[in-house]
């Protein structure tokens, strides 16, 4: 089996319909408006966000989040993944009445259990929500910087790309950077190339979540390649959410050809009827990537991972026999 690594997945968005159904039974909740026939049901980006939030609302305790992380990571490992980074949202935790620390500790419990069962290594990226404003993002950054949890190794920002300008959030990222956290920011998904450029100018990330609309500006693509910024690309998500109309129009092959460092990711997998394994299969089928190139993409993900060098070396040691075989 092809070994894989993922850098871009939202943990609340990774809850399978089966797990959400079990949580609904636990809390006596009605999920018929957003899960039908054992699958998530939504029609557009607005109703997707509603379904996402309704599913997330059914995780309310430290034990619930431990179960969520353990279940997802075991599923990921079964598909060949040896490493996972996922985005966490202190804002979702607080909406559920859980402190950010208890939320993080719960997720960490699940991560430890999944590693014991499968060997999968994983880390958390704390995220602020862009459309909640700079103060909320700074609050998330302060938590990330101060929690000192060994499995929290990055800070990022998700949410509505059209809300505010990256410069408004620069201070939050400075807080995280000074604490030694890796930096990633969502840009170039629903915002155009100018969104990616502004993120590079004002946030100075080592990675960009999505970033695919950089393709609209050839000079920007060259800059991304020259600076070695890693793009966390989510092809199935991009097509399902109509960022691009079909895989044949997705710029992944052009980004690779331009020398950009790219990775493959599932974003919110059950919502988009995907998985990390499917993302790799899509790249092979629609982008013409052979096994050597797919292994190189996994290597890029490990190179860009927010881990200590001992962990990185151990991940490469697992990947090396596969690459050489």
UniProtKB/Swiss-Prot annotation:
Site (Important for catalytic activity): 210
EC class (word): hydrolase
UniProt-listed Enzyme Commission number(s): 3.5.4.2
Cofactor stoichiometry and binding remark: Binds 1 zinc ion per subunit.
Binding-site list for Zn(2+): 8, 10, 186, 267
Signal peptide (from-to): none
UniProt entry tagged with the keyword Metal-binding: yes
NCBIfam families linked to this entry: aden_deam, PRK09358.1-3
Function of the protein: Catalyzes the hydrolytic deamination of adenine to hypoxanthine. Plays an important role in the purine salvage pathway and in nitrogen catabolism.
Protein known as: Adenine deaminase
Species annotation: Chelativorans sp. (strain BNC1)
């Amino acid at each position: 089996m092809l070994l894989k690594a993922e850098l871009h997945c939202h943990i609340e968005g990774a809850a399978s319909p089966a797990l959400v159904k079990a949580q609904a039974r636990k809390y006596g909740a009605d999920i018929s408006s957003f899960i039908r026939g054992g699958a998530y049901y939504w029609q557009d980006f607005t109703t997707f966000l509603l379904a996402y939030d309704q599913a997330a609302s059914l995780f309310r305790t430290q034990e619930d989040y431990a179960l969520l992380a353990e279940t997802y990571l075991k599923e990921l490992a079964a598909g060949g993944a040896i490493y996972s980074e996922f985005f966490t949202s202190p804002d979702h935790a607080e909406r559920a009445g859980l402190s950010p620390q208890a939320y993080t500790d719960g997720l960490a419990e699940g991560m430890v259990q999944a590693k014991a069962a499968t060997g999968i290594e994983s880390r958390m990226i704390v995220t602020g929500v862009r459309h909640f404003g700079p103060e909320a993002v700074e609050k998330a950054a302060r938590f990330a910087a101060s929690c000192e949890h060994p499995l929290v190794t990055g800070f990022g920002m998700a949410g509505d790309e059209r809300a505010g300008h990256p410069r408004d959030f620069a201070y939050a990222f400075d807080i995280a950077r000074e604490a030694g956290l890796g930096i990633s920011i969502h840009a170039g998904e629903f915002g155009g190339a100018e969104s990616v450029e502004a993120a590079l100018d004002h946030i100075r990330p080592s990675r960009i979540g999505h970033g695919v609309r950089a393709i609209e500006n050839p000079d920007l693509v060259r800059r991304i390649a020259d600076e070695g910024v890693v793009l966390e690309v989510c092809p199935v998500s991009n097509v399902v959410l109509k960022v691009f109309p079909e895989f044949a129009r997705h710029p992944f092959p052009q980004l690779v050809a331009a020398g950009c460092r790219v990775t493959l990711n599932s974003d919110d997998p059950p919502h988009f009827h995907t998985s990390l394994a499917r993302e790799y299969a899509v790249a092979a089928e629609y982008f013409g990537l052979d096994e050597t190139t797919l292994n190189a993409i996994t290597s890029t993900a490990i190179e860009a991972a927010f881990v200590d060098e001992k962990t990185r070396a151990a991940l490469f040691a697992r990947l090396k026999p596969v690459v050489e075989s």
